């Protein structure tokens, strides 16, 4: 049975003090839950190396929230996947809806980043999802196909071997309105079946997470669905006790 991936995306939040407290608490509680779960933390870039030093010894994995499309060069203010790897990052979030909406990242840019991550033997967490307008127009599957096709066109049929997908309906991100777990199950099954057309091995081993207003109150309803393989958690992951509750819930389904 595949392990569930429970990932904390802290976005632009945290301080040295709050992160130190969070990690001290987590390290004291987490050991019994690591057998059946893969736990990932994606802090702001400035805290990556500090977090790595705290979590590496207990087998919690480090993720970056974003990278540039370039590995080196005169690109002031950007962060390289190569540099991320050098400081212990294993996973990199690609194409989060906030990057798409606030930084105008399109499928082409996201595909370039995906390829960089794969070529460095890191693991991309590819975020895909539809807007509320697209959902109401019954275009969800069409949009997801377009987002997935951009990856296949750039990297080939085996693109999703050693990769993670996070389905995050854009209308649910940061709104407090989570999607219906049964509908999410259908979409996750669609994603896996679509990838299976290109590569059976990818589809059979693929982890597809759900992200969008996840809390300890609704996490179980998502995780009990057969094709929801984990969670990408935003605001709820900033609260140490809430995050641990979600991990415990995940562990109870294995």
UniProtKB/Swiss-Prot annotation:
UniProt GO BP: gluconeogenesis; glyceraldehyde-3-phosphate biosynthetic process; glycerol catabolic process; glycolytic process
Top-tier EC class: isomerase
GO cellular component: cytosol
Active site residues according to the UniProt entry: 96, 168
Record field: catalytic activity: D-glyceraldehyde 3-phosphate = dihydroxyacetone phosphate
Keywords, ordered alphabetically: Cytoplasm, Gluconeogenesis, Glycolysis, Isomerase
Localization (cell): Cytoplasm
InterPro entries with a match to the protein in the record: Aldolase_TIM, TIM_sf, TrioseP_Isoase_bac/euk, Triosephosphate_isomerase, Triosephosphate_isomerase_AS
Gene3D superfamilies, alphabetized: Aldolase class I (3.20.20.70)
Matching CDD domains: TIM
Entry GO MF terms: triose-phosphate isomerase activity
Keyword Cytoplasm in annotation: yes
Family as reported in the entry's similarity comment: Belongs to the triosephosphate isomerase family.
Assembly with partners or alone: Homodimer.
Summary of the function given for this chain in its UniProt record: Involved in the gluconeogenesis. Catalyzes stereospecifically the conversion of dihydroxyacetone phosphate (DHAP) to D-glyceraldehyde-3-phosphate (G3P).
Protein name: Triosephosphate isomerase
Lineage: Bacteria, Pseudomonadati, Pseudomonadota, Gammaproteobacteria, Enterobacterales
